[in-house]
Amino acid sequence: MYQVDSEDANFLFMEKAESPTHISLVYLYDQSDLGDDPVRFTHIREHIGNRLNSAPVFYQKVQRTPADIDYPYWVDDKKFDLDFHVRHLALPKPGDWRQFCIQVSRLHSRPLDMSRPLWELYVIEGLDKVEGFPRDSFALYFKVHHCAMDEFTAQELLQSLHSQLANTRQHESSSQHIAHLPSNAPAPLEMVLRGVLNNSVRTLRLMLQSASNMRTLSKIVTRLSIRMAQDAVEGEQSGDSSNRFSQPLSAARVFEGTFYPRQLIDDYAQLVPGATTTHAMLAICGEAMRLYLEKHGELGEVPLRALLEVNVRNAGAHALVGNRIAINQV
């Protein structure tokens, strides 16, 4: 049986109406070199339809257990409808960057349908006045639930869909994995019995681990308590640190972006020995955030912190399902 593991299931159980846990990727395409034979929506739909076996996420949905007694199962969607998942829309005139960002914001604000495979792909046409792109450019907006994959896997999957080859490395690895996936979930009674057994095993394993690591756990709890007390005191001394990013969440999301030459990012990274392009992008985003808060008079004295997902897969590893990430605070 292929069951959602604990790390992936967390993204399901944490989801709320105001904080959905899906992720998305945006790709922009310049098709001016194609002349009188541009890419059409029907071509993209057919191309994706022929590659649904590249990963189980495309045709499997999540089946939750009664009362969430256990982690959910991945099961085949017997009513799979490609037209529900691959959609087509166009920007209103004049089709500029602002309208594109508004459209992406609306799409990302909508939760995924949990009764279907947890992904959607939008072909967005009408990008006629986006600086740096010619008329008739288009974009792909790909949205997938975080319980199915992280952004690194999503990027690899979407890139594999661009291949004209039927047997890429990604296709080969995923086809081997698909052979072991169930087509149906267990019956409700069986799911309950499995849940009781699995929870008993997990509890026993946790007790054994806790017994062998009690001294280490005690030290961790002590240090954590001290740190929390220090943070509380520092927070009181520093005064009100609230800004527009520390307010209660709503379901609405805002997307914005800009373009930088890759060489500029590489040159920026070389200014600090050992720095990578990721470090350079973090520095750019951090400075942009500082300037934004400063403009609105909300910079404050308390540093703004964010969480950064880091890919922890081994080099060369391919996994078109699940999450293999660590969370760093920056």
Language-model segments: residues:
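Soluble acyl-CoA-dependent acyltransferase catalytic core bearing the H(X)4D motif
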Residues: M1-E7, V26-D36, E46-N53, Q60-V330
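Generic start-of-chain signal for non-secretory N-termini
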Residues: M1-I23
